[in-house]
């Protein structure tokens, strides 16, 4: 979960988010080196008193500043293409969830079970219990088994929404009349918070997402108890 004055990314709770964090750091190093090189070139030109009115071309220099940027772009593109493939690939998901965005709450359906669906509303500030985050807690959490690939089918019942949980490295737009899908793999137990990431109206800021990742036997007990109720 994000905290006050946090400058970095949230702690990764899935293998995909770990890879995204590594790629972010790698790309940031490359961009920092490019910035230093460009700044050095600008300063060198500004302070240099050497001029040549008859210097019209430089084939070697033009080749260098064409080839080197191309190589840099390739070095950035290859890891990103791998990540795009990992984000898009769905290999035999253990569980499929339908998530529908509404103004201004989420509704969930466990497609592998009969009659297992519910709405998830934000808990008002006046009702938040001690220790739970303000504006992020919900009345019904999305309970899922840890260390299993989960597929989420995302859509909307009214306007554009976006289902996003940063610590799991997942974000998918909820478009009316269209069914998008995303996958994630919670590597550990815990409670992971997200929010609608597409401006959807007056209460856009008040439709959080809460995923509770639990061991499989705990998940089985939760499903049994919910269906009995």
UniProtKB/Swiss-Prot annotation:
Q: Which Pfam families match?
A: COX2 (PF00116), COX2_TM (PF02790)
Give an example GO biological process.
Answer: ATP synthesis coupled electron transport
Under CDD domains, the record lists: CcO_II_C
* Protein name per the record: Cytochrome c oxidase subunit 2
Q: Which residues bind Cu cation A2?
A: 196, 198, 200, 204
Cellular localization per UniProt = Mitochondrion inner membrane
* Signal peptide span: none
Give the membrane topology: Multi-pass membrane protein
